[in-house]
């Protein structure tokens, strides 16, 4: 929304038979005039607004007043009937405010909240030190949050990154590490379903499989392509980028001994490539967070903690065995 021709760009997108599903924003540039122009053009995307915890948003965004601006933008969008999803980074500094933050967002009419473990990206480690939650710490504290949140009476759905989806209205939940159930796995599945449907393009034109990996790829000089130097058509039909996003899960199992010998592989399919790269430096390595989840019994712990609710990712296996 920072671009001076933002509305013209939106208009041209729709003129070409495409549409905008969502807009990611910190809320600063959201004003009534902007929403009026969108409504006039029949444009009503999901507004994904960053909000990183009551009393902590200003610190993470590096600007005094950022929290107030975000809340103002949320209220404005809801008053104009635009759907809102909140994206919240969780770390050791704001962890204790998470439940109150969720209740506030629900009271503002937010449709969904996505809680993201702030991972070990280069800039985060440089600026925040050891504020990132360890993997077991993340699972333990998010499970405490999930159990408490489901009892609040809130209606807002919550996604806990790489862990849980909570649906309080229907009284159900799903475990994200369980990508596939017993009869769903096959070797030809993509290593990441998300990157098959979304292209990450940086302001400089560099293209990446995943926005969360842009900093790591840039730091390593690993650039699969650039839309200012090559056509998007070429990049999506015959390129290094295409080879990377079309990699199948059997390549992970062939490459990584741990995955090859793991009885849980058919459930997680090697896990998240972003986490595997950030935590191990290996594009085809095991995602350590999934090894912790299955190997340390978090499937069973979650079923126990949320036993009052329906688990729509129920699988038949004996959890808690070290891998």
Short names for language-model regions:
Residues 178-186:
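Short Pro/Gly-enriched beta-strand edge/turn motifs at strand-loop
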Residues 192-196:
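Short, small/polar residue-rich loop motifs at catalytic or cofactor-binding pockets
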């Amino acid at each position: 929304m920072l671009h001076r021709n933002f509305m013209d760009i939106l208009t041209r997108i729709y003129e070409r038979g495409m549409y905008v599903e969502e807009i990611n924003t910190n809320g600063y540039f959201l004003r009534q005039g902007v929403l009026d122009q969108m409504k006039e053009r029949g444009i009503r995307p999901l507004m994904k607004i960053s909000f990183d915890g009551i009393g902590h948003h200003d610190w993470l965004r590096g600007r005094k007043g950022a929290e107030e601006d975000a809340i103002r933008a949320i209220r404005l969008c809801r008053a104009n009937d635009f759907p809102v999803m909140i994206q919240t980074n969780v770390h050791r500094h704001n962890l204790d405010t998470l439940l109150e933050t969720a209740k506030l967002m629900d009271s503002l009419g937010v449709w969904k909240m996505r809680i993201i473990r702030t991972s070990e990206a280069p800039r985060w480690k440089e600026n925040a030190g050891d504020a990132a939650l360890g993997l077991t710490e993340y699972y333990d504290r998010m499970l405490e949050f999930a159990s408490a949140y489901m009892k609040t009476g809130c209606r807002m759905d919550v996604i806990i990154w790489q862990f849980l989806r909570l649906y309080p209205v229907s009284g159900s939940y799903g475990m994200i590490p369980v990508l596939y159930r017993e009869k769903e796995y096959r070797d030809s599945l993509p290593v990441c379903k998300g990157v098959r449907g979304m292209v990450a393009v940086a302001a400089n034109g560099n293209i990446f499989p995943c926005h969360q990996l842009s900093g790591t790829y840039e730091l390593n000089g690993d650039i699969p392509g650039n839309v200012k130097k090559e056509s998007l058509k070429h990049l999506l039909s015959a390129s290094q980028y295409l080879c990377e996003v079309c990699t199948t899960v059997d390549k992970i199992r062939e490459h990584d001994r741990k995955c090859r010998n793991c009885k849980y592989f058919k459930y997680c399919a090697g896990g998240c490539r972003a986490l595997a790269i950030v935590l191990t430096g290996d594009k085809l390595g095991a995602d350590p967070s999934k090894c912790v989840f299955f190997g340390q019994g978090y499937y069973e712990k979650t079923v126990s903690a949320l036993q009052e609710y329906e688990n729509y990712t129920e699988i038949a296996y004996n959890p808690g065995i070290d891998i």
